[in-house]
Amino acid sequence: MKKAFLISFTACMLSLLSYSQTRFNGLDMNMGNLYRLSDAKTRSISPENLTGEKGKAGMADPVDKDKQNVANASNAARDLGTGWKVNPYIRIKPGETFTMAVIDGPGAIQHIWMTPTGNWRFSIVRFYWDDETEPSIECPVGDFFGMGWGSYAPLVSAAVCVNPGSAFNCYWVMPFRKKCRITMENIDDQNSMTLYYQVDYTLTEVPADAGYFHAQFRRSNPDEPSIHAINDGIKGKGQYVGVYLAWGVHNNGWWGEGEIKFYIDGDSQFPTICGTGTEDYFCGSYDFDTNRKNQAGVAESNYTEFCTPYSGLHQVIRGDGHYNVMQRFGLYR
């Protein structure tokens, strides 16, 4: 039996009752509706405006250099003063949790950009909707953005983009009705982390049928008894919207014959949906191998990375025969 190291991050939208709304509320903006006007208000939270309030950005003063996360770049801005990138980032000490954003609704997050330093597996991002005391999203920041192996690889998709050199971008629309709270915890017990970030959101009416964004993080090491639960324990009406896998191989041979199965609404022995193989589920085929020819004209077997708007094999860590021995893969759909 093959053993594998497998990490998964999944996301879903849990919906409420449906409701018809004809007036455009400014949500779900795209190239096809940019001409439509609404009463939505655009706001953005960053270290330069930690509340997102109107007319309150860029107010950090270098004289506050001794206050944590108030004027972190005061030395670089010492000759420029207020209004000149005095606090573009925050620092999170070992074991500390920093509140990145608190937003009063109704509204929706439309885009998040961040570039965290340190060990991405040791940085835990959490999202709380409305009056929640337990988070709907709790995930290492690297896995949330498709970088579960802690090293950069280009990722270009409709929902998540990771750009040089470590710019994490998320375009999931995440509505809330009363409140949104986002935190980042540094569970590294030795090193502080530096975080540049921006949370772009809109304040507007939210349809009654809008769901709340949820995500589960799971890790199996090794994957025994060869069954890894990607999603489990979800109840109620909802919509499965995606998965990211960080897959490590411990043995020789092709690793991707595992079938993705969906057990829905009471399924027990047999699922409702069953795929034909791992690479097939991620919209590839035949081991992700294109048998490209080398300079001598001989076909060589090798993995081919790819990114598309909705699926991809964006990362292949092939090993160097030295300290990085195992092959590792990053896949999304």
What is the role of each PLM region?
Residues 1-4:
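Positively charged n-region of N-terminal signal peptides that target proteins for export
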Residues 21-333:
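Beta-strand-centric surfaces of beta-sandwich/beta-rich domains
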Residues 7-16:
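Bacterial N-terminal signal peptides
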